[in-house]
């Protein structure tokens, strides 16, 4: 529900009026995970739903089964700065896990250089290439990382897409 837009919320209201007493509407969403604002999504629809429909029973799924407490503590600390969130506190029984690190790069080249050096250091200390992974938000970010990996003989695979220089739009230009 966190990624619905204003029109979709109006449709819901047209189908089931907030004045209805049938309690026949159920909504699932996570106000901390709205990522489609660039497509018109309005996370405020969740709070509006709670207010407009006078929700009396709100179930918060706060236990996380995949992440460690170090990761969840960091996530809780970051998202706590959002004054418009509905509020929850994520927790786990998975243990503390490894400490997390944060690196602030000045630009994409510095980020790729640092990432490359970290992976080379891991590999030199015995970590197999297959145990290293890089996650990025969109495919355009892979270009500079691929350049650094290639220049440093780091083998890599792209899952869910093509290598930057194998993409048709890049081939047409070069």
Locate predicted features.
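Conserved helicase NTPase motor core
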Residues: 1-48, 63-67
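Short alpha-helix plus adjacent loop in nuclease-associated cores
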Residues: 32-37, 66-67, 158-174
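Generic alpha-helical secondary structure signal
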Residues: 27, 41-48, 70, 114, ...
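A cross-family signal for key residues in well-ordered alpha-helices
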Residues: 13, 47-50, 117, 174
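Helicase P-loop NTPase motor core
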Residues: 54-57, 62-155, 168
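Short, glycine/charged-enriched secondary-structure capping and boundary segments
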Residues: 10-13, 40-44, 74-75, 147-151, ...
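Active-site catalytic pocket residues across diverse enzymes, especially alpha/beta-hydrolases
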Residues: 15-19, 53, 149
């Amino acid at each position: 529900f966190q990624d619905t837009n204003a029109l979709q919320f109006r449709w819901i209201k047209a189908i089931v009026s907030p004045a209805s007493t049938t309690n026949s509407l159920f909504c699932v969403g996570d106000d901390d995970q709205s990522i489609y604002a660039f497509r018109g999504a309005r996370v405020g629809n969740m709070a509006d739903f709670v207010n407009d429909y006078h929700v009396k029973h709100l179930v918060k799924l706060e236990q996380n089964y995949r992440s460690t407490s170090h990761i969840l503590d960091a996530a809780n600390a970051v998202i706590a700065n959002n004054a418009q969130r509905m509020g929850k506190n994520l927790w786990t029984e998975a243990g503390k896990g490894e400490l997390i690190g944060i690196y602030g790069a000045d630009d994409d080249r510095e980020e790729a250089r640092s990432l490359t050096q970290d992976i080379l250091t891991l590999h030199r200390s015995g970590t197999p290439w297959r145990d290293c992974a890089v996650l990025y938000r969109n495919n355009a970010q892979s270009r500079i990382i691929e350049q650094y990996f290639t220049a440093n003989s780091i083998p890599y695979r792209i899952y869910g897409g093509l290598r930057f220089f194998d993409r048709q739009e890049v081939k047409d230009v070069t």
